[in-house]
Regions:
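Negatively charged
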Residues: 2-13, 17-30, 35-36, 40-308
């Protein structure tokens, strides 16, 4: 009997121990589940909103005049390099931009500049590396564009420019690779086009240009590749055509030109390809014709009115 009681007590103790272990296991499992649930909640919780990245752009700075503008440009290039964005400068008060980037390495962004009050852009990009986008510029008040792109790398789109107020286009594209579309330009107020395309790659259409107010066409296409139609040009007010087509490839029809007011035709076709008919030109008595056809196809058979 004692043995049976002992056996029952052992089984009872074992059962109690098993129950205790099971409870602990259950509690442990519950705790683990709670931890996992908490971890899951933390994981699935909405992340905190990331802060927007700060921009490196500068606040708009107003340039009071040309000198102020030049200082701002110099400081910006020194800080950010020659390809920097200068659109943060408000240039709407500036009226003179002559020589602004003359001999400069600058080739950054000035596409959004408001140049609507500028009157002088002479030498602005002369001998510079600039070839940026200025297609949307409002140049309607600019009067002087002399040497604006002379010997520069510029070859951008300026086909939509309103140049109706321009008077001086001397050497504007001289020595450049520019060959863009300027066919629709209103050049009716220009009086000086001397050397405008000299030493250039230009061979665009300018057949419809109104050049009736131009007085100086000296060296206009000298040493250029130009050979397009100029037959309809009204050159009745031109006084100087010296060297106009010298050393050029021009050989178009200019037989009906009214050159009665021209006083200087010296070197006009010297070393050029020109071999057209200009026999009906009416030239003034006191005109300078020195070396007009020298080393050209017409040298041996010049017009009858020609006098060395």
């Amino acid at each position: 009997m004692k043995e049976q009681a002992t056996t029952k007590n052992v089984k009872k103790a074992a059962a109690t121990k098993k129950t205790t272990v099971s409870k602990k296991a259950a509690e442990s499992s519950k705790a683990t589940a709670t931890k996992k649930s908490t971890a899951t909640k933390k994981t699935t919780a909405s992340p905190k909103k990331a802060a927007a990245p700060k921009t490196a752009g500068q606040k708009t700075v107003v340039a009071k005049d040309k000198n102020d503008l030049m200082k701002l440009i110099k400081a910006a290039i020194k800080k950010n390099g020659t390809n920097c964005d200068l659109n943060f400068i408000d240039v709407s008060k500036v009226t003179d931009m002559s020589n602004l980037f003359h001999r400069s390495q600058f080739n950054g962004d000035i596409s959004k500049w408001d140049v609507s009050n500028v009157k002088d852009m002479s030498f602005m990009f002369a001998v510079s590396q600039f070839n940026g986008n200025i297609s949307q510029w409002n140049v309607s008040k600019v009067e002087d564009m002399g040497c604006m792109f002379q010997a520069s790398r510029f070859d951008g789109d300026i086909s939509q420019w309103n140049v109706s107020k321009a008077k001086d286009m001397t050497s504007m594209f001289a020595g450049t690779h520019f060959n863009g579309d300027v066919s629709r330009w209103n050049v009716s107020n220009v009086d000086d086009m001397s050397s405008m395309f000299s030493f250039s790659q230009f061979n665009g259409d300018v057949s419809q240009w109104n050049v009736s107010n131009v007085k100086n066409m000296s060296k206009m296409f000298c040493q250029s590749k130009f050979n397009r139609d100029l037959s309809q040009w009204n050159v009745s007010n031109v006084k100087d055509m010296s060297g106009m087509f010298a050393v050029s490839q021009f050989n178009g029809n200019i037989s009906r030109w009214n050159v009665s007011n021209v006083g200087d035709m010296s070197f006009m076709f010297r070393k050029s390809q020109f071999n057209g008919d200009i026999s009906k030109w009416k030239v003034s008595k006191d005109i300078d014709m020195s070396r007009m056809f020298e080393e050209s196809p017409l040298a041996d058979n010049p017009p009858k009115w020609y006098k060395e």
